[in-house]
Each structure stands twice: as structure tokens, then as C-alpha cells.
């Protein structure tokens, strides 16, 4: 199972949110590139990055920060937030971003996902974020009436091979991942599933690994020191 340390960006700086609430944003590190180098040193191959300003503005905002991390550290960057057009996707992939995460657009514009997967194949992932099992969009502000595994199946049907599943109620809380929902989505589709939200310590990593998931995203647990990243990578 791959470990994806997370860097969420507001105004060029690494921040964390509590349950996706922008009013709770607080800076957790001085510099994204410096933070990413720390992840590289711990043995990580990937970094999970989110353009939080982009999520709200519905367009790329902190592009240079992500490009710098990819170019300067050599880490593979998977990136989500505000990516809404083929031009956005093309721009990022041509500037060294390894994987693009399409979130809100997966529900609202599945044709774009289909087109992106056709052109970029495994470089496209879909982020499915759920509140009480129903998909939430637009920086988690809007809640839909679409059940999370139904969207996963729709995405699988258009060729998506990689899904990042977040239980919003666990995100940034250090209360443990939602194993039930992760098993449910993993059983519903043949896509690679990455768990996001709630990872607290090495026991959570071991539990996730036992569920045959593709990856786990770790954010707050790294910054708060409840998870040793090197230990997680080696687990």
C-alpha cells in the first residue's frame, strides 16, 4: 500500500482544515518544497497536494507551488482542487504533475472525466468525498443525493482506474479512517482505492493495509506527530 503524505495549499502555504471547514484553516509548515523534501527523506514516492483556493475559485490558483514541488523534489505529485477543464489538466501534466484528481467535476461533468481518461489514462484519478455516505462537492460545501458507491461505479464505467475516497466527517480529526465505507467502495468497483481522512497512527495504516487498498493519505497525523511517516512507509 502506498503512503501519500498530504500538503493542502492556501495562498502558497501548507495548511490543514478540520472536517473540510475553511474557517478552521491554519498553517502547518513554512514552505511546500521544504515539507515535501521531508517526505522524500522518509521514503515516500508520492505527495498528495490540494489547491484549496482553487477548490473555491473553481480554477487553478497555486499552480507554481505544485510545479515547484514536482520539479525540485522529484516526488510524484497527485493534485486536486479547481481543475475543471482539459486545458487545466493538460497544463499540469505538461508541467510535471503525475496524476490529476478530478473532484466536483466528476459528478457535474462526467463527460470531461471520460475525455480526460481517454487522453491521459492512469494519470487521471477521481476524488469522491462523502458526507454521511452521500457525495459532497465544491470544496465540500454542497451535498448531493448521489450515494458514494453509485458515483464510483459511474466513474469505473467511463474508464477511471483510480479513486480517492474521503469521509469528510473524519478528515483532519485524527479519529481513525472509515473502514466500513472503504471496504464497501473497494468491493463495489475494481478501481484502485486510496483512503483519505481520519488516519491517526501506525495501527490505522496496518488496518487499511489489511483491506487491500491501493493507498492511504496522511495529513494531520504527520504534522501533529501521531504518525511516524518512515514507519508508515515501511509497514
Predicted segments with their positions:
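Alpha-helix-loop-beta-strand connector modules within alpha/beta enzyme cores
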Residues: 57-78, 114-129, 174-201
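C-terminal helical cap(s) of enzyme catalytic domains, especially alpha/beta-barrels
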Residues: 112-119, 124, 186, 209-235
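Conserved anion-binding
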Residues: 12-15, 19-23, 97-171
